Amino acid sequence: MQAATGASMLNFGYWLGDANNPVDAQTNLCTLVGKLADLRTCRTLIDVGSGYGAPALQWSEEYKLRNIICVNINSQQLLNGFKIASSKIENARVSNAWCLRTNVTYINSSSLCLPFATGTVDRIIALESAQHFKPFDTFIAESYRILQPKGLLVIAMPVTVSLDNVLKKLFNLGILNLTWSSEHYGFEYVKSTISRYQFEIMNVSMIGSQVFEPLALYYTQNRKELRQKIMAYYPSYIEKILWKSLVKMMTVSKKGLIEYVVLKAQKL
């Protein structure tokens, strides 16, 4: 979808209110996660699996955060994120430029070995990235280690529901078994793993109906235009696979077989 939108966000988006395009929906999801993480009182935020760093820049501007660290194993995405931030600095007023220049740091590292001392941060966010972390419990253990007491972990990610064995996943997910780049973690597994590492789950929101279905409908309704944009970078069969995958996501979402969870947990 990035090729279609031309934006630097990498999430499905939260299609609430007047959001009628992917960029607005993606901004909505970042806003939702930022509020849930209570970033107004945050001192040090670690954005794990930060992509191109667009959410971090949004949170920096919204909350005037003192210290945001983008952690990503993909060095090319980090480099592009730094270039995006630098471009914003060049076009910003001096006060905003100072904020962006000094408050966002980029670190090339794995989510399974976070390069921070024990008990040194008060917020960790994984916005649609934790679905890729393997093993998931190692990331949760690392999050617990580096968080201060009462520090917050906020995760936004798609999950499977009631697909508790491989055969069920293969049968029900269909094409998504190949095209949905994810470990396809189950919702109950995610919850139980977080609780097992002495986190208290404080808030859980299931927003799948405002993620998968409106995204698929938007793509279907605007497919002709989006297809041309995508085919400027990829062969036509890639676009066809993308469209079929989005429609399949909408179908299994309506059946209650996948969800999108936004979860906040506090270190005990």
Which residues does each predicted region cover?
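Conserved Class I S-adenosyl-L-methionine
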Residues: 205-268
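Conserved alpha-helix/loop element of class I SAM-dependent methyltransferases that forms part
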Residues: 24-43
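Acidic carboxylate diad motif detector
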Residues: 155-157
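Class I SAM-dependent methyltransferase SAM/SAH-binding core
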Residues: 44-113
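Short, glycine-/aromatic-enriched active-site segment of Class I SAM-dependent methyltransferases
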Residues: 159-181
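A short glycine-rich, Lys/Arg-flanked "PGG" loop and its adjoining helix->strand segment in the class I
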Residues: 137-152
